[in-house]
A protein has these predicted regions:
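Positively charged, low-complexity terminal tracts
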Residues: 1-90
Length: 90
């Protein structure tokens, strides 16, 4: 389990994503996003997987913060070098 709080949770209606984090968890998420942005700036497609311990990871917390929401055990963040993202692939 990470020494910070960071969860991604889907609302009961599954139409809204909630990100819960303490200061350290949000800083970790910012570092991941910053690293992906650097790759995208360099013209490279890159991604990162964030997972709970239950899914053999250590990046996400395992305890949902909203009892009505569904905890996501894996989040994949993709960085794209163009605005079109996957739609710009040959």
């Amino acid at each position: 389990m990470p020494d910070y709080l960071l969860t991604f949770e889907l609302s009961k209606d599954r139409d809204e994503l909630f990100i819960h984090g303490n200061a350290a968890g949000l800083r970790y998420l910012a570092r991941v996003a910053s690293r992906l942005a650097e790759h995208a700036d360099g013209g490279r497609r890159e991604h990162d997987h964030l997972m709970t311990e239950e899914w053999a990871g250590h990046e996400l917390s395992s305890v949902a913060q909203d009892p009505a929401a569904s905890l996501l055990n894996q989040v994949t963040i993709r960085g794209w070098p163009t605005r079109g993202g996957a739609h710009d692939l040959p």
